[in-house]
Amino acid sequence: MTLPGEQHLHKIQFYATTAYSCGYLADKPAQSLIATPHHLIDAHAYSGLIQLGFRRSGKFAYRPHCETCHACIPVRLPVAEFQPSRSQRRAWKQHRNLSVALIELAFSEEHFALYSAYQAARHEGSSEDPETVEQYRNFLVQSNVESLMVEFRENGVLKMVSVVDIVRDGISAVYTFYDTADKHASYGTYNILWLLDWCGSLNLPYLYLGYWIKESRKMAYKQNFLPQEGLIDGEWRPIHTERYAQPK
């Protein structure tokens, strides 16, 4: 199977996975379209794929390919047009004391400990087993594209790690994990604001945030960053006119 689009993708083939349980919408099956062979998915090829709605997990580039559901919408932020809300400006001011370091992808016990604590807090009460070091490595440490880890520290203490990909027209936020112990912190918001600022300093027009699903509260935070574009029917177009209102 091939996809229409950019010329440099002509050597890449695509196959659909078998159905599996959706991780975001309960009781719904899901399928993905996988780009292959993996060694051809370099920074150049991935820059084309991300514009077609693909994302990266380890060495795999994929996008949703569900027969009866089209809830997953790839979203990106036009950097030059971004308008922070009042709460986002507060988050920016609150965490400006964090020191930031860009490092190559590599396994770190310190990173894995923070990741494990983050997963435990986010999936409290879940019957799923904790992720192993191997699963973590496969997910976040392996990449065939231009990827970096962004470390955020406060007085030398690791508070957050953001894994990102650099593509032709922007930065793609792959995954972020942070210290959940401080209930008054806004690390996730600050991470997106910092990445937007970094995009601007590199003259990159877009920050890619992955998929947004209207019915998923886990993804509702993405709607708070405006203006925003979504890939709908093969075309990037403006979506969301209002920020997410937390249900009372």
UniProtKB/Swiss-Prot annotation:
Pfam families: ATE_C, ATE_N. Transmembrane segments: none annotated. Disulfide bonds: none annotated. It is found in: Cytoplasm. Functions in the N-end rule pathway of protein degradation where it conjugates Leu from its aminoacyl-tRNA to the N-termini of proteins containing an N-terminal aspartate or glutamate. Belongs to the R-transferase family. Bpt subfamily. This is Aspartate/glutamate leucyltransferase. It comes from Methylobacillus flagellatus (strain ATCC 51484 / DSM 6875 / VKM B-1610 / KT). The gene is bpt1.
